[in-house]
A protein has these predicted regions:
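Acidic, Mg2+-coordinating active-site environments of NTP-dependent enzymes
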Residues: 210-352
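Phosphate-binding loop of NTP-binding sites
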Residues: 2-43, 49-248, 252-260, 316, ...
Length: 352
């Protein structure tokens, strides 16, 4: 309606058109400020750069309109600018997209500076042990479980929240990694082939966990085989002295041969030659009791408040890596018992 009234006024009286546009803009701004959003916009440095670039584009469009259509009459010039700004407002999403596109070389240069700084920080910590975690699902839970167990013996940092892309990992390194950290657990997500390899080239993990290979993000990967290849970029990047822990409960993992590094397979469902197994799983009112069996006759009886095979599988991976890294059985047993279930996810509810 506002655009219709503006168009009508612009043909009858340009000054009225500009006044109408000003009123409409002011009302829109007030509504924007007072509106409550579920997740408000965070004004990061990049967001500010995009909005400034968008404003500059609007000014340039307004100036061009004035020069082309304004002529020598002041009122026509003002009308041309008002019309241009109205068009910019209606196409604000296109303006911001164009600003983002124009800033791409600048953002690339800035991001590369952040990456170089992160590399330098990692290079200054040669004794830091890096564990990579990836998978179609289960990687976040495994990351948290492993962090809880390793923290019993090591000063351990994990990538927080959804900081699981290259730049998210870079931000974690620059803002959270401290010289006294001993272990760095890196969750790695991928939407395209090469994404995990890029993160590995940055952090150089010595241990890798592949929790699952499933039909996730097929719109970008194209096939389950490409998903498998991308998840195993983590395993392919490990040094010969490292170790890969892979979940043989998934056929696309069990069928994948690994020859470049020691490969330790784990399973909750059947043996299938896996080195690590969760057996004798019993669900109780207080959680789950189960036994973990590993190489060289290793065995440990555990109790957790968690429920469900998926949680036990993720716990199994975390326990296997912890044992590999030298965490004692008593510390593992205590940490596993202390892990809290995620709210609304297979947690026990007691009623009167």
């Amino acid at each position: 309606m506002a655009i219709f009234l503006y168009s009508l006024a612009s043909f009858t009286h340009p000054t009225a058109a500009m006044l109408l546009m000003g009123i409409f803009g002011a009302v829109t701004m007030v509504r924007y400020i007072r509106k409550k959003y579920k997740k408000p916009l965070v004004w990061t440095q990049r967001a500010r750069r995009i909005y400034v670039a968008g404003a500059v584009l609007c000014l340039l469009i307004g100036f061009a309109a004035m020069m082309i259509f304004g002529g020598d009459i002041l009122e026509r010039r003002l009308y041309s600018v008002a019309a241009a700004f109205t068009a910019c407002y209606c196409a604000s999403h296109i303006i911001l997209m164009a600003a983002n596109l124009l800033l791409r070389p600048v953002e690339k240069h800035i991001n590369q500076g952040y990456i170089n700084d992160a590399r330098s920080r990692l290079a200054s910590m040669p004794d830091l042990r890096v564990v990579g975690v990836t998978g179609s699902y289960g990687k976040t839970s495994t990351k948290h479980f492993l962090h809880r167990i390793l923290s019993e013996q090591f000063d351990t940092l994990m990538t927080p929240g959804s900081f699981n892309t290259t730049l998210g990992v870079v931000r974690t390194i620059r803002e959270y990694l401290k010289p006294y950290n001993e272990v760095f657990i890196v969750e790695m997500v991928a939407k395209n082939p090469g994404d995990i390899r890029e993160i590995c080239d940055l952090v150089h993990p010595e241990i890798g966990i592949v929790t699952a290979v499933g039909p996730q993000h097929l719109e970008s990967f194209g096939s389950i085989e490409n998903v498998q290849a991308t998840k195993f970029e983590l395993v392919d990047a490990l040094p010969e002295s490292g170790a890969a822990f892979v979940n043989d409960d998934f056929e696309m993992i069990a069928s994948r041969e690994v020859s470049n590094v020691q490969c330790l397979r784990y399973t909750c469902r059947d043996e299938r030659g896996a080195q690590w197994q969760a057996v004798n799983i019993v669900y109780t009112p207080s959680g789950t009791d189960f036994e973990v069996k590993g190489p060289e006759g290793f065995s440990i009886q555990l109790h957790t408040r968690l429920l469900g095979e998926a949680n036990i599988s993720d716990l199994l991976a975390a326990v296997a890596v912890a044992v590999y890294m030298g965490v004692g059985a008593d510390r593992i047993r205590y940490a596993v018992a202390q892990i809290e279930p995620v709210e609304h996810r297979l947690s026990v509810k007691r009623t009167a």
